[in-house]
UniProtKB/Swiss-Prot annotation:
Residues 1510-1588, 1609-1700 form the BRCT domain. The modification Phosphoserine is found at residues 168, 176, 198, 220, 298, 313, 360, 385, 398, 415, 425, 438, 442, 461, 492-493, 591, 593, 595, 735, 750, 885, 929, 962, 991, 1104, 1126, 1128, 1327, 1359, 1435-1436, 1439, 1443. It comes from the Eukaryota. Residues 1-23, 166-328, 369-398, 417-497, 520-642, 679-699, 718-746, 778-899, 914-1510 are annotated as: Disordered. There is a cross-link at K1461 (Glycyl lysine isopeptide (Lys-Gly) (interchain with G-Cter in SUMO1)). This is Mediator of DNA damage checkpoint protein 1. The modification N6-acetyllysine is found at K769, K1496. Tandemly repeated BRCT domains are characteristic of proteins involved in DNA damage signaling. In MDC1, these repeats are required for localization to chromatin which flanks sites of DNA damage marked by 'Ser-139' phosphorylation of H2AX. It comes from Mus musculus (Mouse).
Length: 1707
């Protein structure tokens, strides 16, 4: 990269000398600072950098003294020749080397590297970030600024200097990672005017060239990032710039920056300056202002430095609000503005801003080939702009709230997003900010889309025009109807829409979600109104599409369209906006990536949606596009109908689609940011994150995630994540989804992005627009959806599985398509991108996503999360899609009804929360997306029937939406869900989800959205809960946690969403009549798993009756449960699920409850809770959620564990998948699910996400409470199919287990269940086969299965979110409870039982591992019960035992009984006695058989029974991936510290801090053989036989480990001791303090000044002079060996370790 290069010192010396001489006088003040990120070494620190040479090294006399062993005495030198010159970094021949993080590069000694602002540097293993301080010297700065040469020379350093470069810079920052630095720097930058920007820009290499720098910079940045095509970027940039300039400001970047700056000047001086400096500069500026906050995020997301920067920037902008616009406006934004101005004279400000934002994003995208830079830049800008204007216009209050949210959440988002993927982050941020701006922004975007579609964004730029043309093609569809146009636009416009909208929309979407939470109605309304008029000016479809296609305008157009729809449904609008925002963000990012091509691609995506790709990629997407277009048209029509019935709905779906995209986008974006070239792929991943994330995940809160997210969850992110991978998988899958345009939306979306799907279904938005997309998709796809779905189904099924191989490759494409699916646009863009550089990017993104998802939380986590989320996401997507497809066919009638409004609205609602989740998790959103996708598909299908069935759905949806912000919304949603049950399938879940989200969302959204990614995640979780469940799971898996949380959350999100989708819809349809009951159930289930079920027609059928029946039971319980979510919830959830239907009206209640719990849980421990809750929620839906709440705390742990388990989680999903598919097949209705499953299976990872949903689906359908649950289960498995093992297995295990397990698990669920899940995930691989077995069983069992499924979903969820798992189980339990009501299942029981057994085994296995005993028990119990049926028993027994217990005992009894029962089955021996009561023999046999079949059954049940909770294993002194996998496969989790660990694994006795702490606490210290043997046995074996043996060390220290452990358990060694450790002691005082605390002593941080018995000072000879006071007081001065040796021997003998007077005197 240009960053690191040998410098021609001769040529530069003169210049530098000159500069330095001029600036030497300023050496007094630091020119920059080097930030050392916090870590095990200590807190974060900033070192000032002055003119001249700043030596970095271990020596105390170094300017930057890093006193760490791995740092050489003189490690490196940072030379600053002049204040405005880029510092030169040189390695001084250090031992461990100096590395540039972005792009990764080791700096050879003697080679100079120009440091860019915010650039990340790795000194040995210590990550640092260079920040340029904006302290422009009076003279030098200007001269330097004047000197083009310098800027050029310091391409990276001085990018900011060049105004044009600024644009590039932003892009550059993205790739370079300057973003982080920029964020911080930018703050200063504002004051510095151009120079600071210059600096910031400087940080971006691209901007080095002043004039061309903008385009060049973009290219350059891109280059830096991924070596994208600068030419393209330039042309794209130029185009965008030109267009923007023409419309807004003739001048390109500079002018644009200026103009934009003017509006935002007051708020965003930085932005302005930055803008002036360049787009990147502007973004940076925005970021900078928020830099401190963002900076941290940035720091956190060091990996995604630039991206974080962007994210930061976005956040900043959003926070600043005004800055938002300006930053967005700078280059692309300006262009966008231009487009807006042209397109939207009516609402010039908002439209303009939005356009700027969206357009800018698009423009930037168009303008710059560098997707990443632009994306990043763009996204933030979009958010800001949109948010800014719209918020201002909409409501200052809203704005304030949004801002607060944004800040809260933005920051969280930032951290996650940037971490997950900077690009993603940015989109997420955008979304988040947008959401923050809330509905406004999103509204604006949406409105703009509405208007924007009318907006004639065509003028934007040639590219834009091109896009417009492309759009026009889709426009042929627009004729369908304005609304249709909107919807279509959504689909059609998705490409450009995605492109622009993604960036813009990401903002909008997030904002919308946020606003929705904050002020759902108003924001949306305002934005919508505002924008609608703008957009309205032009023909809705045409203008809109044109705008969308235009690229710059495109996003806005897309947003516009959506808003247009949104106007109809304000809440939906908000949601829509959010979706749009997200999508826009994604698109924008993508567009940016695509640059000219990208815009076209975006357009293509739109076109794809339209059915007419502009670009080859588009063409690639085109095929799907045609179909998609059809689907879109169908959808659009459906949407239109809905729209007619309820424009809001339509809007929502469309918007939501976008949101999903956004979610995806953020993650993707972030991912892209990480990899400029791979911008698009990243963007796709971003969908999740979650998702991502985290929607972006990650998440957005997963925001995760994740970025991915958290992801996004990315994005997700982090989660997506989780989302990214899903996206990717989906992306691969896209081939599957891609095939049918309509489908593509759904399917693709799902593949692309579970989130996307959701997006399409609005799932993304909601939770993942859980409903939105379905609605839109359903609407549009409904007509052709069936065919498409069939096609897709077949295709998806085959495709999904086949695609798995292809997936990565196609994944990139597919992912894009998925995104597009989410937003056709997005998909298109993805396709285009994909084709452009998607594949590599996709792969990278997938990895990135994985990473990002985890990363969303932290870059590291992000990757895991990213791919996991992606996987999850993809899986859900695919699974959902497939399932949805199949199911949809069946349910199309039902679903369709709802899609229009219900889905959309719900989705919108869900979406908002989801977005949050998505953002947080990146993955979160995504997860929902998949569900939503399914839902969307379902929705479409259901729509007709649903519509017919529920004529109300739309209105309810609206109401729902309106209420969304509030619990009432949830209620409405629920109601709606019920009403629009069919549609709601998508929606129902959504509903559930949405209510959750709404309530959660609303509540938490505001708070969590920004507040914390995690929180949002939880909210998302809550909101997503069903969704989030997935997201959570996903996050757990990856999404995000999208970012971790993000990734995990994302993933969970994805998964959950899927679950949710099916459940809700199915239940909902069923519930139509019983709606209240079923919906709730559905909600729950939906949330949990009904989603999937929804696809299962059976589900609904059964569901109605069952639902009612069960519903009632659960209803009560759920409430009770709700009251005491934890235990009760377990039980309750069971009832709850049943109740779901009943509750569904209650769903709203339940949902509220869930949201509450979720909220609570989520809020309380947003991330974990989120994850867990969502899972719980998913299964139980509302009930579960409460449960989750309660359990969530536990779950969170797993969650944490999940951070790593994430993978496990993912795996689990895989296992699940088989089950899913089989289960799915079992459920005829579920069969669609099966495809999903398959898809998922193919997806593998995606599976995770999907997985939960899958189980849910199955269960859902089966039960619909039961079926629903089952279907979800199936679906989940489906989803999980991707993550086949876990999913399948989990579902199976889950299914059987769940019923009983759930109750049982409920209580213990947190620990055990998740473990089981994880284990299942892993274990499930074998399970797959079982799953299949189970599959058949499930159908037989249908109700039973449903329960099983439910369980599975739960398990799956759990798998995804280990922690969540328990909750999941709970829901499952619920199902069982329901099941008793539905003895139907009992007959089936036998088959299901095996299934259950399998699942149980798996689950148990999984759980045993983590939760070990409890889970096992639960799992087994549940399984067992279900198995022998225990079905009957369960039903009966559960009924009897559970009946009474059902409410609570059920859980308890169930747990116990279940545990016992199940355990016997699985454990056969252990639980046999207990299980005997319940058809133990039969069950056991079955179980056994299944277990045998699965091969892992053993492990699950037994261990769990043995251990109440899954072991939390900590490793010390060994890095053993095999052992870690064994832990996760067995359902255990990986502890991050001794405090949470239940077992320590090492290879020998060593006096490490962890070892001594564990010994002090009496924790078993085991050898690796324990894990290996446990893995073989399928459960965690008793630890006593596997204690570490090290005779040599025991001899050396004269102690026996076994004896010491016994003594430590009997009594803590230092119980009465108060100990102070002086600073010079080794290990250092903090670690000694940890040992002291673990041994029961009290650590005194400061020197004591009084005497007390057993108060001692641990010191060393060097510190003896410090000990004069204690020495006078007579306090014993002991050597460190008192502690080190004393703990080993478990003997406290101070007198033996007193430092002698001799030593003291000598000292």
């Amino acid at each position: 990269m240009e960053s690191t290069q040998v410098i021609d010192w001769d040529a530069e010396e003169e210049e530098e000398t000159e500069l330095s001489s001029g600036s030497l006088g300023y050496s007094v003040e630091p020119i920059g600072q080097l930030r050392l990120f916090s870590g095990t070494h200590g807190p974060e620190r900033d070192f000032p950098l002055y003119l001249g040479k700043n030596v970095v090294g271990r020596s105390p006399d170094c300017s930057v003294a890093l006193p760490f062993p791995s740092i050489s005495k003189q490690h490196a030198v940072i030379e600053i020749s002049a204040w405005n010159k880029a510092p030169i970094l040189q390695d001084c021949g250090s031992l461990n080397g100096t590395q540039i993080v972005k792009p990764p590069r080791v700096l050879p000694p003697g080679v100079s590297h120009r440091l860019r602002d915010q650039e990340l540097i790795l000194f040995a293993d210590f990550p640092c970030q260079y920040h340029r301080l904006d302290v422009p010297p009076p003279l030098v700065p200007r001269s330097l600024l004047t000197i083009e040469k310098t800027p050029r020379i310091r391409i990276e350093s001085q990018n900011s200097r060049v105004l044009l470069a600024a644009d590039s810079e932003e892009e550059g920052d993205f790739p370079s990672g300057r973003c982080v630095a920029n964020g911080q720097r930018n703050t200063a930058s504002p004051s510095a005017t151009v120079v600071p920007e210059s600096d910031e820009e400087v940080s971006s290499p691209a901007p080095s060239v002043p004039g061309p720098s903008s385009p060049f910079g973009l290219g350059s940045d891109t280059d830096e990032e991924q070596g994208q095509q600068p030419g393209v970027e330039e042309s794209s940039l130029a185009d965008s710039s030109g267009a923007a300039g023409e419309a807004e400001q003739p001048e390109a970047n500079g002018t644009t920056a200026g103009i934009q700056a003017q509006p935002t000047e007051h708020k965003l001086k930085d932005t302005k300056v930055k803008k002036e400096a360049g787009r990147a500069g502007v973004s940076d500026g925005s970021v900078l202002e928020r830099s401190p906050t963002l900076g941290e995020d940035s720091d956190t997301e060091v990996d995604e430095d630039h991206k974080p920067g962007f994210a930061d920037s976005e956040t900043d902008v959003e926070e600043e609000r005004i800055p938002v616009t300006p930053p967005v406006a700078p280059v692309k934004k300006n262009q966008v503005l231009l487009a807006v101005g042209i397109g939207d004279p009516e609402a010039p400000g908002v439209a303009h801003l939005q356009d700027c934002l969206a357009g800018s994003g698009t423009d930037v995208e168009d303008k710059t080939a560098l997707d990443v830079p632009l994306e990043r830049n763009h996204t933030p800008m979009v958010i800001n702009s949109d948010t800014d204007e719209e918020e201002e216009e909409e409501e200052e209050v809203s704005a304030a709230l949004t801002l607060a949210h944004l800040k809260e959440r933005g920051i969280g988002l930032w951290s996650r997003d940037p971490g997950a993927e900077e690009v993603k982050s940015q989109p997420q941020v955008l979304v988040e900010q947008s959401q923050s701006a809330s509905g406004r922004d999103s509204d604006t975007d949406v409105e703009e889309e509405s208007s924007g579609r009318k907006r004639e964004i065509i003028p934007d730029s040639p590219m834009d025009v091109d896009e417009a043309l492309t759009v026009t093609q889709p426009e042929s569809q627009p004729p369908r109807r304005p609304n249709d146009a909107d919807e279509y636009m959504d689909m059609s416009s998705p490409g450009s829409h995605l492109v622009v909208n993604q960036a813009s929309f990401a903002v909008v979407g997030k904002t919308r979600a946020q606003v929705e939470e904050e002020v759902p109605g108003p924001s949306v309304i305002l934005g919508e109104k505002h924008q609608v008029p703008l957009e309205g000016a032009q023909p809705p479809e045409e203008a809109w599409e044109t705008a969308v296609q235009e690229g710059s305008s495109s996003p806005e157009a897309a947003a516009s369209v959506r808003p247009s729809q949104q106007p109809v449904a304000e809440d939906a609008g908000t949601e829509c906006a959010t979706a749009v925002s997200e999508q826009e963000s994604t698109l924008e990012v993508r567009s940016q990536s695509g640059s000219p091509a990208a815009p076209v691609e975006q357009v293509v995506i739109h076109t794809d949606t339209s059915g007419d790709p502009t670009l080859p990629q588009r063409e690639g997407a085109q095929t799907p596009t045609g179909r998609e277009r059809e689907a879109h048209v169908g959808r659009t029509k459906s949407a239109k109908e809905c729209c007619d019935a309820e424009p809001e709905d339509l809007c929502l779906p469309a918007t939501q689609c976008f949101v999903e995209g956004e979610s995806q986008h953020p993650e993707a974006v972030q991912s892209l940011e990480n990899e400029p070239t791979q911008l698009f792929p990243c963007t796709l991943p971003q969908e999740p994150g979650p998702s991502h994330l985290s929607l972006q995940t990650p998440g957005a809160d997963t925001l995760d995630v994740p970025w991915e997210v958290l992801a996004t969850q990315p994005f997700c992110l982090r989660e997506q994540s989780e989302t990214s991978e899903l996206h990717e998988a989906h992306g691969s899958q896209p081939s599957l989804p891609r095939e049918p345009p309509g489908h593509q939306h759904l399917v693709h979306t799902s593949p692309v992005h579970t989130e996307l799907l959701r997006i399409e279904g609005r799932e993304i938005q909601t939770v993942e627009k859980a409903m939105g997309i379905p609605k839109e998709m359903a609407d549009r796809m409904t007509p052709e959806r069936e065919p498409l779905e069939r096609e897709i189904r077949g295709r998806t099924e085959n495709s999904e599985r086949d695609v798995i191989g292809e997936e990565l490759i196609q994944g990139t494409k597919d992912r894009e398509p998925k995104k597009v699916l989410a937003r056709d646009s997005q998909r298109k863009e993805a396709d285009k991108d994909l084709e452009g550089n998607r594949e590599s990017l996709e792969v990278e993104i997938e990895m990135s996503k994985d990473s990002q998802k985890r990363e969303r939380k932290v870059e590291k986590p992000e990757p895991k999360r990213e791919w996991e989320p992606a996987d999850l996401e993809v899986t859900p997507d695919r699974g959902v899609t497939e399932e949805g497809s199949h199911d949809q066919k069946g349910q199309i009638a039902s679903l369709t009804l709802k899609p229009g409004v219900g889905v959309k609205d719900l989705e919108g609602l869900a979406s908002a929360p989801i977005i949050t989740g998505s953002q947080a998790d990146g993955g979160k959103g995504d997860p929902l997306s998949p569900g939503r996708q399914q839902r969307g598909r379902l929705s479409c299908q259901t729509t007709p029937a649903g519509k017919a069935s529920r004529g109300d759905p739309e209105p309810p949806d609206h109401c729902l939406f309106s209420s969304v912000p509030e619990a009432s919304t949830q209620s409405l949603l629920t109601s709606q869900s019920q009403k629009q049950s069919t549609p709601q399938p998508l929606f129902s879940t959504s509903s559930s989800e949405i209510p959750l989200p709404e309530s959660l969302h609303t509540k938490p959204n505001v708070r969590p959205r920004r507040s914390s990614r995690m929180t949002p995640s939880p909210h998302s979780s809550a909101a997503l809960k069903p969704n989030t469940t997935c997201p959570t799971n996903q996050p757990a898996a990856s999404r995000p946690t999208s970012r971790p949380t993000r990734g995990r959350a994302n993933r969970s999100s994805t998964r959950t969403p899927e679950l949710i989708v099916p459940v809700d819809p199915e239940l909902q349809p069923s519930t139509s009549t019983e709606q209240p009951v079923i919906p709730k159930l559905t909600s729950q289930v939906t949330e949990g798993r009904v989603q999937m079920p929804e696809p299962l027609l059976t589900g609904p059928e059964i569901q109605s009756p069952t639902s009612t029946e069960q519903s009632v039971t659960p209803d009560r319980k759920p409430r009770a449960t709700r009251g005491r979510p934890s235990k009760s919830p377990n039980k309750t959830p069971e009832p709850l699920i049943s109740t779901g239907p009943e509750l569904q009206p209650p769903t709203s209640i339940e949902q509220p409850v869930i949201p509450k719990p979720t909220s609570r849980v989520t809020r309380g421990r947003p991330r974990k809770s989120s994850v867990r809750t969502p899972e719980s929620v998913v299964s139980t839906g509302p009930e579960l959620q409460p449960l989750t709440s309660i359990e969530q705390p536990v779950i969170p742990e797993p969650r944490a564990t999940r951070g790593r388990p994430s993978k496990s989680s993912i795996k689990t999903p895989e296992s699940v998948v088989p089950t899913g598919p089989e289960l799915q097949p079992l459920t005829s209705a579920k069969q669609p699910v099966t495809p999903n499953l398959t898809s998922r299976a193919s997806r593998g990872r995606s599976s995770k996400s999907i997985r939960t949903p899958e189980p849910v689906v199955q269960t859902g359908p089966e039960f619909h409470p039961s079926t629903s649950t089952e279907q979800p289960d199936t679906r989940e498995p489906s989803s999980q199919a991707r993550t086949r093992r876990s999913a399948v297995k989990t579902p199976e295990a889950s299914v059987p287990t769940t019923p009983e397990l759930q109750p049982f698990t409920s209580k213990k669920q947190p620990a055990p269940k998740p473990t089981a899940l994880v284990t299942q995930g892993r274990t499930y691989k074998p399970s797959t086969e079982d799953c299949e077995s189970v599959g058949p069983v499930a159908p037989d069992f249908e109700p039973s299965t449903s329960t099983d499924h439910l369980v599975t979903p739960k398990v799956t969820d759990q798998s995804l979110t280990l922690q969540s798992s328990p909750l999941s189980a709970s829901p499952v339990s619920s199902t069982p409870d329901l099941k008793p009501p539905v003895p139907i299942a009992q007959p089936v029981t036998p088959e299901p039982i095996p299934q259950a057994n399998h699942q149980r085994k798996r689950r148990a296995a999984g759980k045993q591992g983590s939760r070990t005993v409890p889970l096992g028990h639960k799992s087994y119990s549940a399984l067992s019960e279900p198995e022998p049926q225990s079905s009957a028993s369960q039903s009966s027994g559960a009924s009897e035992a559970d009946s009474p217990r059902q409410k609570r005992p059920r859980r308890q009894a169930s747990q116990k009984t279940v545990v016992i029962k199940e355990e016997p089955v699985e454990t056969e021996v252990k639980e046999e006695p207990q299980e005997t009561a319940i058809p133990t023999p039969e069950k056991r046999k079955r179980d056994h058989a299944e277990e045998v079949t699965q091969g892992k059954p053993t492990r699950s049940r037994r261990t769990k029974p043995n251990q109440e909770t899954a072991p939390k294993v900590l490793f010390t002194g060994v890095m053993d991936s095999r052992g870690e996998r064994a832990v996760l496969a067995l359902g255990g989790s990986l502890a991050s510290s001794v405090n949470e660990a239940s077992h320590l694994v090492t290879d020998r006795i060593r006096r490490t801090v962890k070892f001594l702490c564990a010994l002090g606490k009496g924790i078993p210290i085991l050898s690796l053989n324990w894990l290996y043997q446990s893995r073989k046995a399928g459960c965690f074996l008793p630890p006593d036989d596997y204690l570490v043996t090290d005779p040599e060390q025991e001899k050396n220290f004269s102690f026996s480990l076994r004896d010491s452990l016994c003594r430590a358990r009997e009594r803590r060694l230092l119980e009465d001791y108060e100990i102070h450790v002086t600073p010079g002691v080794q290990p250092p005082p903090p670690q000694m303090g940890e040992i002291i605390s673990c041994c029961g002593g009290t650590f005194l941080p400061s020197m004591p000044h009084s005497y007390k018995l057993h108060r001692v000072i641990i010191t060393c000879t060097e510190d003896l002079p410090r000990c004069a006071i204690p020495s006078r007081l007579g306090l014993p001065l002991l050597s460190p060996e008192f502690l080190l040796t004393g703990v080993l021997k478990q003997e406290a003998t101070p007198e033996a370790f007193v430092l002698s007077n001799l030593e003291m005197s000598s000292t």
